[in-house]
């Protein structure tokens, strides 16, 4: 084998490797996610039950599985109610478009956070300032698909599979520090039915899984259900912003 042929083989091998490492963004997967995001964005109201499981690293036990269940109600651009039960305790998040109330059923304590933003903007600011988590919030962001594409190394449509008895589009992807999978209902509404995230940059690769059930589209949700009425003897506490590292 002469030098020219050796050089050709070497360069060809490099090109094959480079092609193999190139990001793969499946247009079918993007189209499904775009459709889901557009439908959710057009909803005037909705409700859904979210069951989540997540891993926490233990020095003695390795990954320990925890779980929570949430009932979420969304109305218009600025009303949200989330009732949560599970390993993180029992609490309620209630937003009436003017004030977010965090109520701990376990401690019978509540705190108030003033806000007059849309639900999405409120979630974003409250999460950054106070570290409060809102289940399923990612799917309600109008930039959901753009955010996924911005960090994805790969995004592919795998095929049709089932979540419970529901046929779903199965989509999987990878990013720098995680892998993720979405199951989107194969029907007229294209609603999220399940998601799994594996944090590959963290010790032991902890996972987060959420299953969405009991979707109700555009239900009649009265404004009164988003108003918080303090239970008897409930104590009002001050909400303390988390320390931001410089």
Regions of interest found by a model, annotated:
Residues 1-25:
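Bacterial Sec-dependent N-terminal signal peptides
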Residues 22-32, 104-167, 229-235, 239-246:
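Flexible, processing/modification-adjacent segments and terminal tails
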